[in-house]
A protein has these predicted regions:
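Glycine- (often His-adjacent) and acidic-residue-rich active-site loop
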Residues: 1-31, 47, 77, 160
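Crotonase-fold acyl-CoA enzyme core
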Residues: 30-146, 169, 173-178, 182-186, ...
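Short, charged, surface-exposed hinge/linker loops at domain edges
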Residues: 150-159
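Short C-terminal tail/terminal secondary-structure segment
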Residues: 157, 193-199
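Hydrophobic aliphatic residues
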Residues: 10-13, 92, 153
Length: 199
């Protein structure tokens, strides 16, 4: 994703540009975070500007050495938008995030892997296949449990330990009514692999 269309942004007033960002990017990022299924980003090429934010909003990322993230905002005189600062700083910490955002340079796949910005580093031709294979692997797990785990992790980003314990306990209730929990416990007791159905 190459980011925002600068020909469109350039024709907007500052107030209209602000409204465009809030009205368009906020709902997309909210959907990324509230979806109770993991999102795997297959980044084949350079994800720039808000495209980098969308990439980091994915729960998991697959990249190649040639893939890159580019916080290009600074290169045209802007600061980050679309939640890009929130997403990057939580991945790599304040100082490294500031370095990347003010540097305006491509962060290649290998560096992304070292920084924890991508989960898997593969050959370019394998990106889609690896992402699909990972998605299939995740689909065989208890989807209610995965949804709970994703929400727990997101909640923990902005809350203390004791609040997180309470949140986890409340979220866990949904799993207690699931067929997957019954299957998981039965499979464990019978020393066999569980056959989860996502129910």
């Amino acid at each position: 994703c190459s980011g925002a269309d600068l020909t469109t942004i350039g024709t907007l007033s500052p107030e209209d540009s602000r409204d465009y960002i809030i009205d368009n990017y906020k709902p997309i990022l909210n959907n990324f975070l509230s979806l109770r299924k993991p999102i795997i980003g297959a980044i084949n090429g350079t994800a720039a500007g808000v495209g980098a934010a969308f990439a980091l909003a994915c729960d998991f990322r697959v990249m190649s050495k040639e893939s890159a993230l580019l916080y290009a905002f600074i290169n045209i005189g802007l600061g980050p938008d679309g939640g890009a600062s929130w997403l990057l700083s939580r991945q790599v910490g304040y100082s490294k995030a500031l370095e990347i955002a003010t540097g305006g340079k491509r962060v290649l796949g290998e560096e992304c892997f070292k920084l924890g910005l991508t989960n898997k580093l593969v050959e370019s031709k394998e990106i889609i296949d690896v992402a699909k294979s990972w998605a299939i692997e995740l689909s065989k797990k208890p989807t209610i449990g995965i949804g709970i785990t994703k929400q727990d992790m997101i909640f923990s980003l902005n809350n203390d330990l004791l609040s997180t314990i309470e949140f986890e306990a409340k979220e866990q209730v949904a799993a207690f009514y699931s067929e997957d929990l019954k299957e998981g416990v039965t499979a464990f007791l019978e020393k066999r692999k569980a056959n989860f159905k996502g129910k």
